[in-house]
Every structure is written in C-alpha cells, then in structure tokens.
A protein has these predicted regions:
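Generic detector of short, locally flexible boundary/turn motifs and exposed helical patches
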Residues: 30-32, 151-154, 164-170
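Secondary-structure boundary elements
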Residues: 98-163, 211, 219-220, 225-231, ...
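Active-site nucleophilic cysteine motif
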Residues: 127-131, 164-179
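N-terminal accessory/pre-domain segments preceding catalytic cores
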Residues: 1-123, 211, 245-254
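N-terminal start-of-chain detector that recognizes signal peptides
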Residues: 2-3, 37, 158-159, 171-176
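Short N-terminal helix-initiation segments at or just after the protein's N-terminus
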Residues: 6-8, 144-149, 168-169
Length: 254
C-alpha cells in the first residue's frame, strides 16, 4: 500500500511511527498488544503526510498494527497490516517518550514550563506535586467542550496551556507531558472504577518504584495522593484512592 509507511526503528524505545499519505478524512489505526488488548487511534488529518507516534505499552512480544480507511458511515476497510516483534530496552521506555496523546518536542511550551518547575523542585516527588498544582491552578475545566467532544479527540498539551482550558483528557495529557519531559516515567491510564470512567496518572519514583494513581480524575474532580503516602507507597493509601481493588480496571495505558 503506497499511502502508508510504518517506521519500526524505535520499537525498543516503546513506540512506532506511522505516516498516512491518503485522502480519506477518517482513518483508524489499531494496535493489538501481545496480550490481545486492542488500542484504537484516529489519525490526525492535519498530520497526513508526516509521521505520528503511537506507544507500544503492552510489554515484550508480537504486536499487530492495522490501518483502516472509512468507507461509509461506520464501516472501515483494512488497507495496511504489519506485525512487529518488540523487545523493549526496559519497562519504562513507552512512558518516557511523546506520542499522539502526549505530544511534545524540545521546543514545546510544556517542556520549557517543565524545566522551570523542575528547577524549583527538591526531588521527583516534589516535582510531581508542582506539576499537579500548576495544572490545577492554571487550567479551567471546559464544560461545554466536555459535552460536545467527538470520539477520536486528540489532546495537545501546548494548546491547553495557551487556552487555559481543557477537558479531562487535556489535563491528563498536559500533566503527563510535563512529567515525561523531565525524564519521569509516567503512565496515562484510562479505565473504570466500578461503572465510572476514570483517568489516572502513575509515576515511577527512583526511591519508591511505581506509584499507581498518584493523580486521579474521578469524572468530576482531580485529586493528588497525599505525598507522604505516595512516598511510602503503602497499599492502604492506594486502596483509599481506588476503593476495593476488584472494582478497579485499567483498560489502557498511554
């Protein structure tokens, strides 16, 4: 297929790059992880002809990348398919790099802001708190946008900083970009707590390990785990945030 090229030269760093040169307005990429989880992305029409970046967040093994063009209504036709054998350099790789949902470059406003906040931080945990408070203080929840947002929405951290408003996904994307830009492995996780749709941010702190759900969105409000609990990473503190573990399901990690 001449319209599609896939760059698999960075799979050890936990991402692939795909370029679509066609003219169809709705194109979807499905990435199937080694455990069978299917991630569906909508390509950004503004990026046709250049590469977009997508995470490989399902650990080592064989991934499948399938590209579909919209034919009519909600029907899609497969135009490109490739399998990839992935061996990550380490478990942190997919959570350190930019991707379609957490985009930044060295010139991004988010990276410059991250550097400034980092310079004022005592350590990584302090920096996580600085990021949380910066975003909560400077971004206002956009209720109208939340009610009208279309599926396939792609957040843009710099645009969120410029507008000062955003929906849940915008907050999560900006926080994740700020954290990753300062080399803190960060998972943007989406899933369910009981019936409710949730977003979480989990970070890896060198002194502690992975701290799950250090920042959480419950569908209404953002909250930050008590830093002293985060530092000890005690099971009871995590339980307090997610309730009974059996009700808590991470569906996707970006």
């Amino acid at each position: 297929d001449k319209t599609t090229s896939l760059d698999a030269s960075h799979t050890e760093n936990g991402y692939l790059m795909l370029c679509y040169n066609g003219k169809v307005s709705k194109v979807k990429l499905q990435i199937t992880t080694p455990d069978g989880t299917v991630y569906t992305y909508t390509l950004n029409p503004d990026s046709y002809g250049s590469y977009e970046t997508f995470p490989l967040s399902g650990s080592n093994g064989t991934y499948q990348a399938d590209l579909y063009e919209n034919v009519t209504d909600d029907k899609y036709a497969l135009i490109f398919s490739q399998s990839l054998n992935v061996t990550l350099k380490d478990e942190f790789q997919p959570y350190l790099y930019p991707n379609q949902y957490v985009w930044f470059t060295k010139d991004s406003k988010a990276v410059k802001k991250g550097q400034a906040l980092s310079d004022d931080s005592a350590d990584d945990l302090d920096y996580v708190q600085q990021v949380y408070h910066y975003v909560i203080k400077n971004i206002t929840y956009d209720k109208q946008k939340a009610e009208t947002v279309a599926s396939g929405y792609i957040p843009d951290p710099d645009a969120t900083m410029e507008s000062g408003t955003g929906i849940c996904f915008d907050y999560a994307s900006l926080m994740t970009a700020l954290l990753r830009s300062q080399h803190i492995p960060t998972k943007l996780e989406v899933g369910y707590s009981g019936e409710a749709y949730h977003s979480w941010i989990s970070v890896y702190l060198h002194e502690v390990g992975w701290v799950d759900n250090i920042i959480e969105f419950d569908g209404k409000d953002w909250s930050l785990m008590d830093p002293t609990l985060a530092a000890s990473n005690s099971a009871s503190s995590v339980k307090k945030y997610i309730g009974d573990g059996s009700n808590y399901t991470v569906k996707y990690s970006y």
